């Protein structure tokens, strides 16, 4: 296969709709088509190992030719944040207040740190990984939206943080002491947050909404589409677990009326039991649907 531009295919939706199963099925299918695939789950209630029937591990694992899988965990994210930003946070905080290195652990436990760093981690994977596509299984919709909103608020907050720093330290004091590093660090965080937001809206990112043909699922999908569209380019809608019962037909029609012309819509039939393991996942996505998405993404 020739060189391709790296892509991100992300899956969003409420809990229980089958994001992990569908994202895993896509990862397997693309790997078997010769693409180098990195399957990542940022859902801290992990089910990726159950779907793939693999041992739970903190490190990326190669599960078949062309496919590497990684499950993120909250404590791992906190440790990575400390290694990447802990020293910088200490240098900024200690330049203003009389604090010791213990401030790093305090900030690491602050609300929003895990969500913000998770996005940074995925951004860094996109920049540095050698692969054709990252398939990203996100946290359930509420947590996913919170994660995106925190990143936006973090970016906006850092602009104010620079002003606050100048007020606290004093411009004259900064000039006298030459203490410019904290300002540079704060500004570098702001620019990095901007880069992460830009990455999420990048043309190489293809977001997928996953739902089911049920009343509550439909309502959540409509709200999720409206809110997620502010942050990520949603291209596809997968209606999962379709059995074409009477009520389902009504909501399949509502999905089509609501999203036709906005998203490419795909239906995935119900499987009992739910697919588990690579062999079962091979049967989940139709060849026709796979070819259509492949032609759009690549």
Language-model features: locations:
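Walker A/P-loop NTP-binding active-site region of P-loop NTPases
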Residues: 9-72, 129, 134, 138-152
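Phosphate/Mg2+-binding loops and adjacent switch elements
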Residues: 95-208
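A conditional alpha-helix N-cap/helix-loop micro-motif detector
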Residues: 19-20, 115, 186-190, 218, ...
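Switch/connector loops and helix/strand junctions flanking conserved nucleotide-binding motifs
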Residues: 47-50, 77-81, 142-146, 245-247, ...
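P-loop NTPase motor core
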Residues: 49-106
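Extreme N-terminal starter segment of soluble prokaryotic enzymes
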Residues: 4-8
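C-terminal lobe/tail of nucleotide-utilizing enzymes
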Residues: 196-298
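Short, well-ordered alpha-helices that flank and scaffold nucleotide-derived cofactor binding pockets
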Residues: 28, 32, 124, 226
